[in-house]
């Protein structure tokens, strides 16, 4: 069975909880989710993937985490054309600008953003947000 990759970076565990809920939605749909922390992931694994998910919280002045996730996303830009990508992440301040920038960046590389926008969560995901994440996983599995 083809794996659907859910790759994320998390500091506080909020984005990790979102990744795990997205994976549950994928698995509940009869597909196989492969959840990986970004340091364990390889862009080559995504080369042949039609669909995958990337997650990262807002950092600093509403940017992606710069040590591991930013370099990974820069590599993904080279293979993004024609892919369907779900974006997700949590934030503690600001208004989600980091996600809008990320959506624009991936779209600019030729990727289609699932739902047309990333899924963002303010602080810790509550039950309603976990349910939204599971639903996103089901949408990813249906692509």
Report residues per predicted region.
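FMN-binding flavodoxin-like domain, especially the glycine-rich phosphate-binding loop
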Residues: 2-4, 14-17, 21-38, 48-143
């Amino acid at each position: 069975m083809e794996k659907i990759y859910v790759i994320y970076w998390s500091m506080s565990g909020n984005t990790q909880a979102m990744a795990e809920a997205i994976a549950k939605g994928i698995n509940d749909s009869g597909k196989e989710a492969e959840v990986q922390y970004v340091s364990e992931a390889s862009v080559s694994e995504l080369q042949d993937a039609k669909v995958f998910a990337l997650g990262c919280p807002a950092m600093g002045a509403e940017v992606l985490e710069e040590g591991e996730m930013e370099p990974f996303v820069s590599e993904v830009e080279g293979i993004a054309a024609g892919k369907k990508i779900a974006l997700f992440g949590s934030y503690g301040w600001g208004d989600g600008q980091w996600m809008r920038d990320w959506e624009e960046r991936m779209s600019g590389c030729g990727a289609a953003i699932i739902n047309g926008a990333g899924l963002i969560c303010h602080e810790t995901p509550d039950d309603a947000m976990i349910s939204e994440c599971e639903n996103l996983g089901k949408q990813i599995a249906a692509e």
